Design a protein with these regions (language model features):
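Flexible glycine-/small-residue-rich
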Residues: 177-179
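Alpha-helical/coil-rich non-catalytic "connector" segments in signaling and regulatory proteins
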Residues: 1-172, 185-221, 225-227, 231-260, ...
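Cyclic nucleotide signaling catalytic output domains
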Residues: 259-264, 272-287
């Protein structure tokens, strides 16, 4: 399964601020939210169609009063939208205090856009920016997968990695997640793996985005692999802990076994690390050990 990591809202904001004078008025903590697309939504009924990670644009034609606008904002946040752009002027002249207070509390970004801005141009410009970013991320993901599954054919992936300033000796942080097939109950056997993997990958992507870390997350067979360009240290530990916590949240739905790579992982040995961490995940399942470190690999081979 391929779920391409999207653009970070903060990057969109930097572009829209200079090109369209878009201003942030609340919810700055959410600027690291990922954005898949830009949608114009004017009615509450359409919120239920959102998939999450959308930047919503509205003129407020249907939410003119404070109570309706606050309800609209809450529904967007609960639907997983990344932020809201209000085209102020004709229908909404200012963002109500109650909306600002709520957005600050939950970290949901609210922006204002001058009425003079043509929304068609605004939406198209930002969607093009998102598409370009996703193409770049997609090429990086493809190259890293080739470094794992076709590692001898360096000419197919090293030029792309060089474009991203990644070389054979670049240190890589790698985490492998294993989701065994089947289960003991009928519910486990009937489990929808596709939706589960989709949601788990998106949550992992958001963890890296919040940490300002360049990363790739992909699924192959019963494994989800996380690869990030991050130097050894406390930040690796924090990310590993968050992924472990995430797996605990999902473990009620499906059992997850995690193997965390050591500090010697580089692009040149990525394929070996993938093999070793996959084995360690399966060993963890046998020992009912949900989280394993690569340093345990030697012990696992004694069993």
């Amino acid at each position: 399964m391929r779920v391409t990591m999207a653009i970070i809202l903060e990057e969109i904001y930097e572009v829209a601020l200079h090109r369209y004078n878009m201003k942030l008025v609340a919810g700055g903590r959410g600027l690291r939210n990922l954005v898949d697309w830009v949608h114009t939504v004017e009615e509450m009924d359409y919120v239920s169609f959102l998939k999450g990670r959308e930047l919503i644009v509205t003129t407020g034609i249907k939410e003119k009063d404070e109570e309706m606008l606050e309800c609209f904002v809450k529904s967007l946040y609960e639907a997983g939208a990344s932020g809201l752009v209000i085209n102020v002027g004709k229908y909404i002249t200012r963002v109500p205090h109650s909306v600002i207070t709520y957005s600050e509390e939950v970290g949901f970004p609210i922006f204002v856009l001058p009425w003079e801005v043509h929304l068609v141009d605004f939406n198209r410009d930002l969607c093009n920016l998102i598409y370009k970013t996703m193409q770049e991320q997609d090429s990086l993901e493809t190259a890293l997968q080739k470094a794992i599954f076709s590692h001898k054919e360096e000419q197919q992936y090293m030029p792309v990695l060089h474009e991203h300033h990644i070389h054979k000796d670049t240190e890589i942080f790698m985490v492998q997640c294993y989701f065994p097939a089947g289960g003991n109950t009928q519910a486990e056997r009937n489990f929808d793996n596709t939706q589960f993997f989709y949601r788990f990958i998106r949550q992992c992507q958001q963890i890296f985005a919040h940490k300002k870390v360049q990363a790739v997350v992909f699924q192959k067979d019963l494994y989800i692999t996380l690869i990030a360009r991050i130097s050894p240290g406390k930040e690796r530990t924090k990310i590993a802990e968050e992924i472990a916590q995430l797996s605990q949240q999902f473990s009620g739905q499906k059992k997850v076994y995690i193997a965390i790579g050591d500090e010697e992982t580089i692009v040149a040995n990525l394929w070996e690390k993938y093999r070793d961490l996959s084995y360690l995940c399966r060993w963890g399942r046998k020992k009912d050990k949900q989280i394993c470190q690569e340093e345990e690999l030697g012990i696992s081979k004694l069993w």
